[in-house]
């Protein structure tokens, strides 16, 4: 995405009864519009989680379709715990295309020179310390966040609320 400016939005996880599914739903079933590279994640696995799903989700640099991610979340198979980076990449992405890049994730998502973890990424959802979801996106997508997730705040306002 080059040198494009990124906007950052933050949401307290406690205000989202269905967690990540609420973000997806508010943003027009966002998960179905992309495939997802999931890295730096810690997950809880439900008692009903099939062994194959547990093993798959334990991989680093996991590539998953939005449909599959939604199914696992809705079924209660998985839940993100302390952290995760979910990078939206174009639909139909092949795992070998994703593996061409070593994920480079920058903790300072508010930095003016923040870069997505791969050049294929269109937006990122970051679970910050287990209690806040962060949306990093371009200005056009930012307008959608503002209109459909009014509880999302820019980082300065978000941190001030915890002041």
Q: What does each model-identified segment do?
A:
Residues 49-125:
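Surface-exposed, low-hydrophobicity interaction/linker segments
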Residues 32-43, 81-86, 117-119, 158-162:
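Short glycine-rich, low-complexity/disordered patches
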Residues 8-11:
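Asparagine-biased alpha-helical interface segments
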Residues 35, 61, 76, 149-150:
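Short, flexible coil/linker elements and helix-boundary hinge sites characteristic
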Residues 4, 113-163:
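Acidic, proline/glycine-rich low-complexity IDRs
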Residues 14-70:
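N-terminal interaction modules that seed assembly of large macromolecular complexes
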